[in-house]
From Swiss-Prot:
InterPro entries: AB_hydrolase_fold, ABHD18. The keyword Secreted applies. Glycans are attached at residue 341. It comes from Mus musculus (Mouse). GO terms for cellular component: extracellular region. This is Protein ABHD18. PANTHER family: PROTEIN ABHD18 (PTHR13617:SF14). Pfam families: ABHD18. Belongs to the AB hydrolase superfamily. It is found in: Secreted. Keywords: Glycoprotein, Secreted, Signal.
Length: 464
């Protein structure tokens, strides 16, 4: 399956640059990785937010068909990883849109998490919440992401997260904040409760539901099993400040000497480093700024089947082109990542054993190429560590999960990563024609229908 030309064009038109200041403080990454181990286990995480966690309503607005409540609470993340959130993000804010009449004795509520660039509430309110009031008498709770809207740091430009670590802070905060809101909704007598989101919002909703100790409808739209592909093989990879990431990786040895060793195995596409990896990369993979970055850099043969790491053996592709793909074809069609994922699992300490003397014998272009490749591997590793759903608990009832995906999504590559159906046996995946942008613009009705279907499935299985 090809990738959407509209996705590629839209990305080129945007000015936003990501991670302009680099990886983030090494101390912060260490704390986040340790915290990820805690929230990756439902038995441990479910007790982090108490069932009576305080939530405050600031304003109630009466409208003809609904009530709109604005509220706030202190993010639990500020208690467990103090000082890691920007001061502007510590107070979580939300908007709750409630119908004046319900269709039955149930009072269903769906929490919507924001996608990339979705500041404040108006998009989700207009495109999802208000139609859901009209179509199904279903309430919606819109949580504002850390780093977005009123929670955006003063020195942040638009949606440009300054550090890679900011994304992990956002994810950890949303998991705990979602738990606080779910507890509050239960206390207020609402139910059934579910979660959804589009793009990044769908992925964050997946992580949040994985830590909820009860069956819950989950409808992730335009998201997949990990964010590593988004930032290494998707069109967003072009918006990343790779030069700063490379520079920091090579000037601060803490990344390869300490942080690498904190990354955990999460399945066949894990980060464990192998000696064979560099041998499979073409020597002229020299421009991370090119849109076809990974079709050159990750030029490896790959199949969709899952291979056990013990039995995994790399095999070279016949004649894989490394020329620029025509008509915007990139990444999924030419980048073959299974061999990468297998070789990465063989030896975690490859960087530690790298011979610096031989490195200095390389010419400048070769050194630059190696820096690019190793920074890319490290990005994949840290993204898988904190965002791969296989590093989190399986939701209590995967049959209540309906995943909506675009067949030609250039933002959320599915090639080379584990399928959600493998990680969450029993979930349903619905595929839409087209790419990420066209689905977001024109398929909102199908997203809402998936929400209604998942809630109906819940009532059929669990209604009293």
């Amino acid at each position: 399956m090809g990738v959407s030309k509209l996705d590629i064009l839209y990305r080129r038109l945007l000015l936003t640059k990501l991670f302009i200041r680099g990886w983030g403080r090494p101390e912060d990454l260490k704390r986040l990785f340790e915290f990820r181990k805690m929230i990756g286990n439902r038995e441990r995480c479910q007790n982090l937010v108490s069932s009576d966690y305080p939530v405050h309503i600031d304003k109630v607005e009466e409208q003809s068909d609904c009530k709109i409540l604005d509220g706030h609470f202190v993010s639990p993340m500020a208690h467990y990883v103090p000082g890691i959130m920007p001061i502007e993000s510590v107070v979580a804010r939300f908007q709750f849109i409630v119908p004046k009449e319900w269709n039955s004795r149930y009072r269903p509520v769906c929490i919507h998490l924001a996608g990339t660039g979705d500041h404040h509430y108006w998009r989700r309110r207009t495109l999802m919440a208000r139609p859901m009031i009209k179509e199904a008498r279903m309430a919606s709770l819109l949580l504002e992401n850390p780093y977005y809207g009123c929670r955006k740091p003063k020195d942040q430009v638009r949606s440009s997260l300054k550090n890679v670590s900011d994304l992990f802070v956002m994810g950890g905060a949303l998991i705990l904040e979602s738990a606080a809101l779910l507890h509050w909704l239960e206390r207020e007598g609402y139910g059934p409760l579910g979660m959804t989101g589009i793009s990044m919002g769908g992925h964050m909703a997946s992580l949040a539901v994985s830590n909820w100790p009860k069956p819950m409808p989950l409808i992730p739209c335009l998201s997949w099993s990990t964010a590593s592909g988004v930032f290494t093989t998707g069109v967003l990879s072009k918006s990343i400040n790779w030069r700063e990431l490379e520079k920091q990786y090579y000037t601060q040895t803490v990344y390869e000497e300490e942080i690498i060793h904190m990354l955990e195995y999460c399945g066949t596409d894990s980060f464990k480093m192998g000696h064979e990896f560099m041998n499979h990369l073409p020597s002229n993979a020299d421009k991370l700024t090119n849109l076809n970055l990974v079709s050159r850099t990750l030029n490896l043969d790959m199949t969709d089947q899952v291979v056990s790491p013990k039995d995994a053996k790399c095999h070279k592709s016949g004649k894989t082109s490394i020329s620029a793909p025509s008509n915007g074809q990139l990444l999924q069609d030419t980048a073959k990542m299974e061999c990468l994922n297998q070789t990465l699992s063989t030896n975690k300490s490859w960087f530690a054993s790298y011979n610096p003397q031989s490195f200095h014998l390389l010419n400048r272009e070769q050194r630059r190429s190696n820096r690019q490749k190793e920074s890319l591997i490290f990005m994949k590793g840290v993204m898988d560590e904190c965002t791969h759903v296989a590093n989190f608990s399986v939701p209590v009832d995967p049959s209540l999960i309906i995943v909506v995906q675009a067949k030609e999504d250039a933002y959320i590559p599915r090639t080379g990563v584990r399928s959600l159906q493998e990680i969450w046996p029993g979930c349903e995946i619905r595929y839409l024609e087209g790419g990420h942008i066209s689905a977001y613009l024109f398929k909102q009705g199908l997203f809402r229908q998936a929400i209604y279907d998942a809630f109906e499935r819940f009532l059929h299985k669990y209604a009293n």
